[in-house]
Regions:
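Long compositionally biased, domain-poor regions of proteins
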Residues: 2-198
Length: 198
């Protein structure tokens, strides 16, 4: 059983982090080393369908901080933890709002690439146009010859000089093959092959 005073400390730490009064480094340093804090917050996380065991996740990072999607997941969990305990707070951290702002616009085959979120934000941070407009803009940036890739892990679509290369084709498809090659072409016609293990 967790003492109320201990939970109060956890809630205060979470509020400081989500409101931008504590850096990710500071929060991660406290959070990743406190098994009771992890367990208490993990209970809230389990109530959500996106649940991913935090202790396993932390162990898999081997002391490293999470990447963009891990940070989004962490911030959503912290936010839900505060909501569950009726703690008023403002979401000042940047990753969670950025993800939620653009996630429904980004096509599935690009949704695993955090760079796409930042590209959209740089293109129009005020989100003044329709979702269709942004979707068309993404298609202009991430071109493909005949068909789009089925899906790619994280930031594997090559971008050179700020411009994504044109996708040509892939060998195999996710969930059917353990090894997939994605073929791209530069403007000068030279080819780039990205190897991915499913």
């Amino acid at each position: 059983m967790l003492f109320k005073s201990k939970r109060k400390v956890y809630l205060d730490i979470c509020k400081q982090y989500i409101e931008g009064d504590m850096s990710l480094d500071e929060f991660w340093n406290i959070y990743s080393k406190d098994k009771k804090m992890i367990k208490d917050i993990d209970k809230i996380k389990q109530k959500n369908e996106y649940y991913y065991p935090i202790e396993y996740y932390i162990a898999s990072l081997k002391g490293n901080k999470p990447g963009f999607f891990g940070i989004v997941d962490l911030q959503r969990t912290v936010h839900n933890y505060l909501v569950y305990h009726n703690i008023e707070h403002r979401i000042i951290v940047k990753e969670l709002p950025l993800h939620d702002k653009w996630d429904k616009i980004i096509p599935n085959y690009l949704s695993g690439d955090d760079r796409v979120y930042f590209m959209l934000e740089e293109y129009d941070s005020n989100k003044t146009k329709s979702n269709v407009h942004y979707n068309k803009w993404l298609l202009e940036q991430f071109k493909f010859e005949k068909y789009r890739p089925r899906w790619m892990h994280f930031s594997e679509w090559p971008i050179e000089n700020g411009k994504p290369l044109t996708f040509q084709y892939q060998t195999g498809f996710p969930n059917n093959h353990d090894f997939i090659e994605y073929h791209f072409v530069r403007e000068d016609g030279t080819k780039v092959v990205i190897e991915q293990y499913d």
